[in-house]
């Protein structure tokens, strides 16, 4: 099972302080573990803080975007999920069109026409060790659904959890994570 380019959708009864009602975009998943970015948890960092550090102006299309809290790991670093993939110093290709980049050059060029079409900026990331995510899935902590660029980039962050459930065709109020296994 490879969940790269999928959303993890937290079950409604998840009690973890950070991951409760989270949607996590999985950027890398292999036998060694998984790495993702929470796409619906705003951070206290502003776009102005991010772009002023590079001496660049915030692109008009991102003026009202929030910087996400991507996860509890390396919260002192920035990460950008973006299209198109491009040629950046430190990127992971997630799909044919989406990459996760952690190098400053993507931020410095994000306002340049055509360099980046769509972007979600976060601080920190989410990580699971070898077999950890698979155990959490077996324990009914998460639902999975193929990622959707519209949810990832276009829907306001506060509506992404509901949108992910809608993509699953499930009413979150009808779920309970303590189901048994046959």
Curated annotation (Swiss-Prot):
Coiled coil: none
Entry-linked InterPro entries: AlgH-like (IPR003774)
GO CC list: cytosol
Family: Belongs to the UPF0301 (AlgH) family.
Protein name, UniProt field: UPF0301 protein NMCC_1249
């Amino acid at each position: 099972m490879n969940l790269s380019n999928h959303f993890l959708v937290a079950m409604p009864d998840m009690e973890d302080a950070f991951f409760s009602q989270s949607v996590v975009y999985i950027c890398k998943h292999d036998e060694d573990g998984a790495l993702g970015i929470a796409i619906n948890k705003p951070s206290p960092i502003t776009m102005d803080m991010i772009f002023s550090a590079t001496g660049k102006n915030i692109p008009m299309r991102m003026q009202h975007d929030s910087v996400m809290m991507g996860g509890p790991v390396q919260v002192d670093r920035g990460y950008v999920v973006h299209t198109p993939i491009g040629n950046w110093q430190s990127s992971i290709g997630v799909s044919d069109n989406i990459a996760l980049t952690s190098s400053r050059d993507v931020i410095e060029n994000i306002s340049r026409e055509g360099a980046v079409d769509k972007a979600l900026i976060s601080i920190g990331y989410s990580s699971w060790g070898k077999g950890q995510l698979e155990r959490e899935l077996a324990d009914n902590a998460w639902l999975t659904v193929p990622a959707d660029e519209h949810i990832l980039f276009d829907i306001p962050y506060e509506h992404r959890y509901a949108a992910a459930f809608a993509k699953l065709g499930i009413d979150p109020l009808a779920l309970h994570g303590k189901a048994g296994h046959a």
